[in-house]
Amino acid sequence: MKPTEPIQFDNEPQSNEVRAEILALEPYAIRTFTPSQCVISYSSGSYHYTPEGRKLADFTSGVLVANLGHNPVSWWNRVQTYLGLNALNDGGEYAKCVPLTAYNAITEIEATANQRLITSLQSAPGGSRINQIMWSASGSEAVQKALWAAMKRTPGKDMIIATRGGFHGKKGLAGAVTGSEQDKERDERVRFVSFPKAECIDIESRKQPLDLTSYQAELDALWEECGDRLCCIITEPYLGGGGSLHPQKEYLQLLQQFCRDHDLLFILDEIQANFGRTGPMYAFTHYEVEPDIVLLGKGLANGVPASAAVGRRDVFECLDYGEASDTWSANPLSSAAVIATLDEFEQNDVIAKGLELSRVIEAGLVRLKETQLIANVRGEGCVWGIECADFGDKPSNDVANDIIRACYQGNTDGQAIHLLGALAGNVIRISPPLTMNVEECQHYLDVMYDICQSLAQ
């Protein structure tokens, strides 16, 4: 959607001014449309605050990034310590601390981040194949680097199987393995396999046994067509951008077994799913698979731009020296943030907090079905999707936008919720920080229920 006028709300003069300035000076292309377009002055824990002083519960975690919550003091203290920023108080024009960029050099903090992340991955069930890292600053870059390595592993094997309806990015090969064969400007080296959308449309349907026959047949047909050129399968633990669709674990296990049978690489893009988001530390544990390459990002550094392709040494070493380098990979700031995030998970039992929160979220979202505005609920851990229903003469897409807008405006007591723009048109993602207080989360789920009830009147 491309608004011709800035989004405006009553009683938000400062926010409205910022919205108008953004619309005038930045292109539409840099942001996803959200009917609320929340203006944030500062954030703390599980809440955002607007220039007018309004408080909003953050049910987005900044698109699955702030798994620890926004600006945890202990995390920031760790980041500052790792960077040596205490030297800022020593006086002088320049501080003696770790540089923010170290291109064409290496740092001790980078080495520490490497060791800590590899140790964490290898200690997780399913992480035994992982022994090298390629760092990046964004998810798309991590995807691209992993695919470069896979395509160079065996000369002549440069074709990729991706999941139809998946999302891996908008750039280069990451964009090529996103979507389906119907998209424009499709890379001919990419083929797609179906995803069991109907079978996991709701948490109840996901409990049913999954018939793998048709998916196996698709894979066999692709092997027959282009097996001599195939190098890998790339998929997600769950389809995030495709509508928060969480498959039965047998589906991912089928893809992995196909790779094992044909000596293909199994690449799991869990950039939206890692660091506790689906329950355990890594989604591959949750789905009981053992990928050759795993893609990490978002919650990896709790807000500092960082991503990584982690996987087999024999695969990554197919790339030439410097072939996957870029200005910001493994920069000291992101390295410090990754180490600090690992510290927080290891010392504060964040996983247990997320699992407790998950039960509250599931019950609260299932209750929303009573309003008749919600048709399906699906998810796991602290990442959920509620699929809106057609209601009266309103299509489900409009219902979703109405809910997002009404939650932003809040109830009569001013209690409000920040939500992302709808996925796949009519699916609202619910993904608060794993550290959100359980009672507070329950309260805002109740607020959301009351708002939906009012919209349904």
Question: What residue spans do the PLM features occupy?
Answer:
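Conserved N-terminal phosphate-binding loop of PLP-dependent enzymes in the Aspartate aminotransferase
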Residues: 2-457
